[in-house]
Amino acid sequence: MTHLACIAASDGIAIAKAYRFVQPNLTFSQTTVQDVQAEQQRLAAALAKTEQELRPSKQQTLKKFSAEEAAIFEAHLLVVKDSELIGPINQKTADEGVNAEFALHEVSSMFVALFESMDDEYMSARASDIKDVTNRILAHLLGAHIPNPSSISEQVIIVANDLTPSETAQLDRNFVLGFITDIGGRTSHSAIMGRSLEIPAVVGTGVATTTIQDGDILIVDGLSGQVFVNPTADVIVSYQEKAQSYHTQQAEWSTLVNEQTVSKDGVHVELAANIGSPGDLEGVLRHGAEGIGLYRTEFLYMGRENLPSEDEQFTAYQTVLEGMQGKPVVIRTLDLGGDKHLPYLPLQEEMNPFLGHRAIRLCLEQQELFRTPLRALLRASVYGNLKIMFPIIATIQEFRDAKAILLEEQEKLKAAGEEVSADIEIGMMVEIPATAVMADVFAKEVDFFSIGTNDLIQYTMAADRMNEKVSYLYQPYNPAFLRLIQMVIHAAHQEQKWVGMCGEMAGDELAVPLLLGLGLDEFSMSATSILKTRSLLKRLSVKDMQALATEALQVATAEEVMEKVKQAVK
């Protein structure tokens, strides 16, 4: 038995076989071949295996999603059988006596460059199809395996170096019981998505992919941050009992599902949920959320080969707004860039992508990328209580420009006879220290603030939240950071505006008492944290927590703040 200590990322306990999700090494050299026919047969075998791999993926996608998503795999199958692509590869092998890997790379690169140069969205998408299929064929030529999260059909625990947002979005929780990564922290996107999917997860192991083999029996303890590899029978029994205790506690919390969140001294605050897709609605309602405080719209764009249409986005937003039955739904406009990239939307490589051309900066430059989802949102607004917010706002001019585009699209829709709600609140994320410092200015023009602590902490402390070497500086309880939160809440309340928080701090047991004392109006978190947080808030007095917050703002270190919270709520 091997024991790994790591970072608890998503609550729960899972016991299952390991499924290594490790990208293969697809490097190769150009070689000269003597037997051209044998080399062409190698290519034919790789093509056949690729086709065998794609057909089940198409069928599974058709069952789980829709014909539109399944059409991606149909396009890939057409590439595999395209004589205009395969013919030149075989011809190059015959004419130049080169290996199939090299011929495949040279010919496919030529087609990719050709399609990417065309000023046509459909043809550009074909370039992505060729890249994807080429990698699959190359993997089979090299005897490697490209993992496909959507093809998993048995209960497993995924083991990966990291999981991108698009990969995590494809996980099916009926089969993926948990995951383990080498890198990342509690606020990394893989961790956030783990909580959204309600599956146990641990991150930052450092050695999972080098220690764990396919088929190993694993225990993932997402409560305390531990992994057991091939555990003994006694350890398995112990963790089965621990899992049962956890489920019992969840059942106790479930009695609070239909209750409002009211403090011990009668003050109501709102507990909302963070979501990434309409599929998350079931969990949101099951856990008794009083609204949605963050809908990450960029996940509509992931795990696919082209931009979602306006109608497709409209349907997603309509589904969520109707599903929440009049409860507030805060939808964030596109936050692409940083660590969220799309294969069909190439972005310039940057030295510091988190400080670069992302989110509202990208949208204000590529306005059609911005206007399409805005139109979809405005059309859907009549189906519920919609609030719209813009991410990564740094200056008041950015907010004004974004709002002007939104209002322009609203007027166009009205002129075309479309019905649009007259009561849409327009707010912004507070994720940049400059915004917090100028909150009094912003508060005069916004309808609300939502504090995005994940980015705001790393920008305040100059500490990359994905870098384990500086993780000690990622301090939600640092008095400097708490003072920024206080500034934002005070500025908003001076203008009778409300403040929410949609970062992971909003559901943190130690942070909740402080945030209640600082006057936070809305706590938005992973759905699985709502009932636990409601139980905690019902035991706290706002008056007592205000005194705690005042003390916390006067101390010098995060450690002192944490100690004061523990003493106050023990």
From Swiss-Prot:
What cofactor requirement does the entry state? Mg(2+)
User: Where do the annotations place phosphoenolpyruvate binding?
Assistant: 296, 332, 454-455, 465
Write out the catalysed reaction: L-histidyl-[protein] + phosphoenolpyruvate = N(pros)-phospho-L-histidyl-[protein] + pyruvate
Query: Active-site positions, per UniProt?
Result: 189, 502
One GO molecular function term of this record is: phosphoenolpyruvate-protein phosphotransferase activity
Q: What is its main location?
A: cytoplasm
Binding positions for Mg(2+)? 431, 455
Q: Name one GO cellular component term.
A: cytoplasm
Q: Which GO terms describe its biological process?
A: phosphoenolpyruvate-dependent sugar phosphotransferase system
Task: State which Enzyme Commission number(s) the record gives.
Answer: 2.7.3.9
**What is any Pfam family matched here?**
PEP-utilizers
Q: Which UniProt keywords apply?
A: Cytoplasm, Kinase, Magnesium, Metal-binding, Phosphotransferase system, Sugar transport, Transferase, Transport
List localization entries. Cytoplasm
Free-text domain note: The N-terminal domain contains the HPr binding site, the central domain the pyrophosphate/phosphate carrier histidine, and the C-terminal domain the pyruvate binding site.
Biological role stated in the UniProt entry: General (non sugar-specific) component of the phosphoenolpyruvate-dependent sugar phosphotransferase system (sugar PTS). This major carbohydrate active-transport system catalyzes the phosphorylation of incoming sugar substrates concomitantly with their translocation across the cell membrane. Enzyme I transfers the phosphoryl group from phosphoenolpyruvate (PEP) to the phosphoryl carrier protein (HPr).
Complex and partners = Homodimer.
Instruction: Give the free-text miscellaneous remark of the entry.
Output: The reaction takes place in three steps, mediated by a phosphocarrier histidine residue located on the surface of the central domain. The two first partial reactions are catalyzed at an active site located on the N-terminal domain, and the third partial reaction is catalyzed at an active site located on the C-terminal domain. For catalytic turnover, the central domain swivels from the concave surface of the N-terminal domain to that of the C-terminal domain.
Q: Give the family, as the similarity comment puts it.
A: Belongs to the PEP-utilizing enzyme family.
* Name of the protein in question: Phosphoenolpyruvate-protein phosphotransferase
UniProt source species: Lysinibacillus sphaericus (Bacillus sphaericus)
